[in-house]
Each structure stands twice: as structure tokens, then as C-alpha cells.
Amino acid sequence: MTNIRKTHPLMKIINHSFIDLPTPSNISSWWNFGSLLGICLILQIMTGLFLAMHYTSDTTTAFSSVTHICRDVNYGWLIRYLHANGASMFFICLFIHVGRGIYYGSYTYMETWNIGIILLFAVMATAFMGYVLPWGQMSFWGATVITNLLSAIPYIGTSLVEWIWGGFSVDKATLTRFFAFHFILPFIIVALVMVHLLFLHETGSNNPTGLESNADKIPFHPYYTIKDILGAFLLVFFLIFLVLFAPDLLGDPDNYTPANPLNTPPHIKPEWYFLFAYAILRSVPNKLGGVLALILSILILALLPHLHMSKLRSLMFRPISQICFWLLVSDILILTWIGGQPVEYPFITIGQVASILYFIIIIILMPASTMIEDKILKWD
């Protein structure tokens, strides 16, 4: 009898995606992060569902409903902190996943890469709206500051902001719609992930050498299922360690104060994973310019396939480009640090230099280094 996984219409899809999928034999642990992101997404949807059962999206009761979850609901504190820190783990995996794509030239799979960028925007939007829900000081003021950026759009800006707010300030209507969007977006993300995988399986996975690997493919199961399970164990270990020993390490103490429209916190800042983009936003003195720089800081990823000048795909054999890549990583870490600092000297100057450097590395240095390498190899 033919194996059911090869004949059943549903099992056939699963089989071609996760069992008999031909995979390059040499992909390293940097390729684990795709499956880890899937685990993070499932974890976030599950914990989020249980939180939504007890949360109320009303300005008068939102903060106390989160307190109620932590104090009165069975293991509510665990679910809440798994969800909050799960978001941090999600973004750590996301940044490494994107970084791996840049390093090994995975952006040459244009469709997969572009869907990935859309996914990144969707996850960032979801995380931002989720941060508003506990209705603490940083939730309220973060929502006010970030949504207010849309007022920089000429002519329609002010109307657009009031339309998003559902009034003349961030209030009950804003919180309710943010909760609705925060609930629905993860399911849209799941659909986008399926499209992402569909495009990936059209071309097959890239590998560290960046070379054609059709001659040396192995089945996904059992080799990479075992490898992914190891990665999953490590991820869950770090997440549980964070939740049980330092649940508030990555949060903001201001969010333990209920939202007060009459009292502005001294330093309004988003969650740590947005700090690099926030630093770029703050580095531009002009409001509209800042908003454009903020959007471009992520959208610039879409330019990478067009800026790829090298005859080689991966950075594995390109030492000058490797230096540029690690310069970019260091620059993003500096921007993350600056985003959490007050707006004063010397942080303003450091932020502006780091922001300019961010765009220079991607647009000028990386393509230039590839051309130099091709010249050295006499490939021009």
C-alpha cells in the first residue's frame, strides 16, 4: 500500500513541505531561525488567545485587567510574561533571520525576500499595537508619539491621525481598535508565512556557499527536523529562563504606572526592538524627513537585490564585504543604544552619525566592496 503521506491531499502538502523536502546538505545553524520564528508565532498566538479571554479593551479597566491576569488568573502571570518576552525572542530571531539572509545573499530569491519584508512590517505593526494594550504610561505616550508621526504627511496628515485615533486624542476608541487589529494581524501573518514558504519551496533553500546545490540534496526529515528540535529546545530554554528569572528585564518601568494624559514621562521610548529605527527617526530634525528615514530604514532591505553587484552570492568568500556587514551590525547596535538615551549631547551627534552611516554602508560601501572584490579576482 502506498504511504498515506504521499497520497492524501492534505498530508501530501505537509510531506512536500516538511518531510520529503529536498534540502541542501550543508546549511548551518543560521538556517534554524525560520522554524524558530514559526514556533514563536504559534506561542504568541496561543498565549495571546488566553490573554484575550481575560483582557478588557476599555481605558478605565485595561490596566487593572492586566493586573487581574497577573494576580488572579491561574498561571496568568506566566502567560502574560511568556507573551511579552516571547515578542522579544520573536524579534531576536527575526533580526538574525534577516541578517543571515543579507550575509548569505538569500535576497536574490526576490519573491521570498519581498514577502519577508512585508512580514517584517506586519510583525512590527502587531508588536507596536500590543505594546499599547496594557495602557501604562509608556503604552499611552508611545501610541501618541508614534501615531502622531502621520501628521507629517502633507495635506491629509492631521485628518489621518484623527481617523486612526477615532477622536482628537488617543482614547477608548484607539485602544479598542488597536486590540482588534492586534488580534487579527497574527492570523494575517500566518497567511503571509504560508506564501513566504510557498515562494521559498519554488526555488529551494540557499546554502552558506551560495552555490547551486541540486546535486547534493538530502530529505528534510529526519536530518533537519532533529536540528530544528535542538534549536527549539534552546529557544524555549532561554525564553523560560527570561520569564522566570528576569521577566521585566526588557520592559519599561513606566508601564507599571497607569496611563495619565496629563503627565508626560521624561523619556518616551518604544520597546528595545524598535530602538534602532526610533534613533534614525530622532536623528532627522525635520518631522516628515524623520518619518521617511524611519520607513526607509526597513524598506531599504527591498533595494538589496538591486544593489548586489558581485559575481558571488554569499559573503562566505568575500572578506571586504564581510567587514562591511559586521560594520552594519555594529552600527545597528549603536543605534539601538542611542534610541534608549535622552535627546541631549553627545547622544544626538552619535545618533546622526550612526544613522548616516547605516544608509551609507547599505547603499554605497557594500556595492563598492563587491566591485573591489571582483576586480581583485579579475572577474570584472
Curated annotation (Swiss-Prot):
Signal peptide: none
Pfam family, one: Cytochrome_B
Single GO molecular function: metal ion binding
Cellular component annotations (GO), alphabetically ordered: mitochondrial inner membrane; respiratory chain complex III
Main location (coarse class): mitochondrion
Residues annotated for heme b b562 binding in this entry: 83, 182
Keywords: Electron transport, Heme, Iron, Membrane, Metal-binding, Mitochondrion, Mitochondrion inner membrane, Respiratory chain, Transmembrane, Transmembrane helix, Transport, Ubiquinone
Subcellular compartments: Mitochondrion inner membrane
Cofactor: how and how many bound: Binds 2 heme b groups non-covalently.
Record-listed heme b b566 binding positions: 97, 196
Other remarks on this protein: Heme 1 (or BL or b562) is low-potential and absorbs at about 562 nm, and heme 2 (or BH or b566) is high-potential and absorbs at about 566 nm.
PANTHER family per record: CYTOCHROME B
Function: Component of the ubiquinol-cytochrome c reductase complex (complex III or cytochrome b-c1 complex) that is part of the mitochondrial respiratory chain. The b-c1 complex mediates electron transfer from ubiquinol to cytochrome c. Contributes to the generation of a proton gradient across the mitochondrial membrane that is then used for ATP synthesis.
Protein name: Cytochrome b
